[in-house]
């Protein structure tokens, strides 16, 4: 009988090659570590630009009153907060995250902001979403897809739970379109990000993983092809901040 440890598929965890069964646990450890300071670090590392990137995502989503929205890897709830206001009492927003530490921070933050009634919190794996077919008008995943082990499975799962005509928006770090910007961004990522992580969260390794995971994530055209391959139509993307971040959008037929 073959030893399954010798045949198990591997994937990347940053620049490391690890068995697929271990990646989810390693990613979970990262986000358990950074959850409490996640919002602060977003502001520090992006200079506040993440708020503009998310605002554009909300604008392009076309969410309106009465919609049902799924915010995957919703974390501390930035998108969910805005979506809850847009869908109103007749709509619903589900904040889903596989990491219970991030989910707790998001739940506490939104409750402190008075968000209730039209928001639910669900611990869920993007690769196996626990929702009915044809259920959501809009799905977003912001800065989460690169941490998913089997991205194609996750995209197919998202397609399944979207209503026909529904929209998926993937906001993610990507590849700078200018070579000089890319060099500056690399220097920033591998020097400043781990240092800031050490000073603010006492965890340089998690932010070193962040920098590495960005480099291992598919570039704009590859992700566009992956979304089309999963069954999405009219897939487009918008580069922001010189391609450091890209917003992909696709429709379910």
Curated annotation (Swiss-Prot):
GO biological process: aerobic respiration; menaquinone biosynthetic process; methylation
Residues holding S-adenosyl-L-methionine: 76, 97, 125-126
Keywords, alphabetical: Menaquinone biosynthesis, Methyltransferase, S-adenosyl-L-methionine, Transferase, Ubiquinone biosynthesis
EC number, as in UniProt: 2.1.1.163, 2.1.1.201
Pfam families: Ubie_methyltran (PF01209)
Associated pathway: Quinol/quinone metabolism; menaquinone biosynthesis; menaquinol from 1,4-dihydroxy-2-naphthoate: step 2/2; Cofactor biosynthesis; ubiquinone biosynthesis
InterPro entries hit by this protein: SAM-dependent_MTases_sf, UbiE/COQ5_MeTrFase, UbiE/COQ5_MeTrFase_CS
Gene Ontology MF terms in the entry: 2-methoxy-6-polyprenyl-1,4-benzoquinol methyltransferase activity; demethylmenaquinone methyltransferase activity
Catalyses which reaction(s): a 2-demethylmenaquinol + S-adenosyl-L-methionine = a menaquinol + S-adenosyl-L-homocysteine + H(+); a 2-methoxy-6-(all-trans-polyprenyl)benzene-1,4-diol + S-adenosyl-L-methionine = a 5-methoxy-2-methyl-3-(all-trans-polyprenyl)benzene-1,4-diol + S-adenosyl-L-homocysteine + H(+)
PROSITE patterns: SAM_MT_UBIE, UBIE_1, UBIE_2
Similarity-based family: Belongs to the class I-like SAM-binding methyltransferase superfamily. MenG/UbiE family.
Matches recorded under PANTHER family: 2-METHOXY-6-POLYPRENYL-1,4-BENZOQUINOL METHYLASE, MITOCHONDRIAL (PTHR43591:SF24), METHYLTRANSFERASE (PTHR43591)
Function according to Swiss-Prot or TrEMBL: Methyltransferase required for the conversion of demethylmenaquinol (DMKH2) to menaquinol (MKH2) and the conversion of 2-polyprenyl-6-methoxy-1,4-benzoquinol (DDMQH2) to 2-polyprenyl-3-methyl-6-methoxy-1,4-benzoquinol (DMQH2).
Protein name: Ubiquinone/menaquinone biosynthesis C-methyltransferase UbiE
Lineage, broadest ranks: Bacteria, Pseudomonadati, Pseudomonadota, Gammaproteobacteria, Pseudomonadales
Gene that this sequence comes from: ubiE
């Amino acid at each position: 009988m073959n030893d399954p440890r010798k045949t198990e598929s591997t994937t990347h965890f940053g620049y490391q090659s690890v068995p697929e069964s271990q990646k989810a646990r390693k990613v979970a450890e990262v986000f358990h570590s950074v959850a409490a300071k996640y919002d602060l670090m977003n502001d520090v590392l992006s200079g506040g630009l993440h708020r503009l990137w998310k605002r554009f995502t909300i604008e392009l989503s076309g969410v309106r009153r009465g919609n049902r929205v799924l915010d995957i890897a919703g974390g501390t709830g930035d998108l969910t907060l805005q979506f809850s206001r847009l869908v109103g009492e007749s709509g619903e927003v589900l904040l889903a995250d596989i990491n219970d530490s991030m989910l707790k921070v998001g739940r506490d933050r939104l409750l402190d902001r008075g968000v209730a009634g039209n928001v639910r919190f669900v611990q869920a794996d993007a690769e196996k979403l626990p929702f009915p077919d044809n259920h959501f008008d809009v799905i977003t995943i912001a800065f989460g897809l690169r941490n998913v082990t089997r991205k194609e499975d996750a995209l197919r799962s998202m397609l399944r739970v979207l209503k026909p005509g529904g929209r998926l928006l993937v906001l993610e770090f990507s590849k700078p379109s200018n070579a000089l910007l890319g060099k500056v961004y690399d220097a920033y990522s591998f020097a400043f990000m781990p240092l800031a992580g050490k000073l603010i969260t006492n965890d340089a390794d998690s932010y070193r993983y962040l920098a590495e995971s960005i480099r291992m994530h598919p570039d704009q055209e590859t992700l566009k092809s992956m979304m089309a391959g999963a069954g999405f139509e009219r897939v487009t993307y918008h580069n922001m901040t010189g391609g450091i971040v890209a917003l992909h959008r696709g429709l379910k037929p």
